[in-house]
């Protein structure tokens, strides 16, 4: 089932451009994106806060519907995954670049039926199934 709240961040006018192209037109904003991502709204796009609000709401709803021994596959994109992971770890979105989420990477989050138990991240960004130990599928991308 497709959940629109889990789509990738809207890069707005940056959509489809390589980082080098963005640097040519928006050097200061790109610098801020790297240094203070939680403060940037991409031109005609979204902010990390926008993504986090919609993705956390969707994740919480998914979690609330789980039953004993349910196995759920959630497929999402880089910014969505990173905001969910930041939220689970209780870290600021200013630290979002500390988390790698490669294209096709697998992250496993164990949920518990007891709502007082915090979900556990048991695997993060597994990419070996893509043919290499180090993921380079997004080289040059934002």
Residue ranges, per PLM feature:
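Phosphate-coordination/substrate-recognition cap region in phosphate-metabolizing enzymes
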Residues: 1-30
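Conserved histidine-centered catalytic loops in small-molecule metabolism enzymes
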Residues: 1-5, 110-142
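Amphipathic, non-transmembrane alpha-helical scaffold segments
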Residues: 23, 48, 52-56
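Short glycine/proline- and acidic residue-enriched helix-loop micro-motifs
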Residues: 29-50
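Active-site catalytic microenvironments for nucleophilic, acid-base chemistry
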Residues: 61, 65, 87-91, 112
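Generic beta-sheet signal
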Residues: 68-79
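GST superfamily/GST-like fold recognition
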Residues: 78-82, 105
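Domain-level recognition of soluble alpha/beta enzyme cores
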Residues: 92-116
């Amino acid at each position: 089932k497709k959940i629109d709240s889990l789509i990738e961040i809207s890069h707005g006018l940056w959509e489809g451009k390589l980082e080098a192209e963005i640097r040519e037109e928006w050097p200061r904003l790109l610098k801020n994106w790297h240094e203070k991502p939680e403060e940037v709204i991409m031109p005609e796009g979204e902010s990390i806060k926008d993504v986090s609000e919609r993705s956390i709401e969707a994740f919480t709803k998914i979690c609330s519907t789980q039953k004993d021994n349910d196995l759920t596959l959630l497929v999402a994109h880089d910014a969505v995954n990173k905001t969910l992971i930041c939220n689970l770890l209780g870290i600021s979105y200013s630290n979002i670049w500390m988390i790698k989420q490669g294209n096709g990477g697998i992250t496993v989050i164990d949920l518990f039926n007891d709502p007082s138990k915090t979900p556990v991240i048991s695997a993060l960004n597994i990419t070996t199934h893509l043919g290499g130990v180090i993921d380079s599928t997004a080289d040059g991308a934002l």
